């Protein structure tokens, strides 16, 4: 092994295996592009993005870490979201949750 070397298993690496997903349509109603990163709590994204927001509590984009999706003005895209793993506690972002999601999620 070389110092700093990373040895990965052979074959494809699957992300978010076994986690609940949701597909939704998202429209950018604003006049500027909006980019959403892979780990951003989707419920708290820019208000110019129009979608069924209540359904997205506790989810983020189901895309590889470090990537993002860009919504141009007037664009409508279908995206796949995945549940956030862990303790179901969300802090930061736009400060809309700042605590536990338990009891705050709306059923699909």
From Swiss-Prot:
One of its GO terms (molecular function) is urease activity. It is found in: Cytoplasm. Its EC number is 3.5.1.5. It catalyses: urea + 2 H2O + H(+) = hydrogencarbonate + 2 NH4(+). GO terms for biological process: urea catabolic process. SUPFAM superfamilies: Urease, beta-subunit. Its main location: cytoplasm. The keyword Cytoplasm applies. Keywords: Cytoplasm, Hydrolase. One of its GO terms (cellular component) is urease complex. It comes from the Bacteria. Pathway: Nitrogen metabolism; urea degradation; CO(2) and NH(3) from urea (urease route): step 1/1. Signal peptide: none annotated. Heterotrimer of UreA (gamma), UreB (beta) and UreC (alpha) subunits. Three heterotrimers associate to form the active enzyme. Belongs to the urease beta subunit family. HAMAP family: Urease_beta. This is Urease subunit beta. It comes from Microcystis aeruginosa (strain NIES-843 / IAM M-2473).
């Amino acid at each position: 092994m070389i110092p700093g070397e990373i040895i990965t298993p052979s074959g494809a690496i699957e992300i978010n295996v076994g986690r609940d997903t949701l597909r939704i349509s998202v429209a950018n109603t604003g006049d500027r592009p909006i980019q959403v990163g892979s780990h951003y709590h989707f419920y708290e994204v820019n208000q110019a993005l129009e979608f069924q927001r209540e359904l997205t509590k506790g989810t983020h984009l189901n895309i590889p870490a470090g990537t993002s999706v860009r919504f141009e003005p007037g664009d409508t895209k279908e995206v796949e979201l995945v549940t956030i793993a862990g303790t179901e506690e969300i802090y930061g972002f736009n400060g809309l949750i700042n605590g536990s999601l338990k009891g705050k999620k709306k059923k699909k």
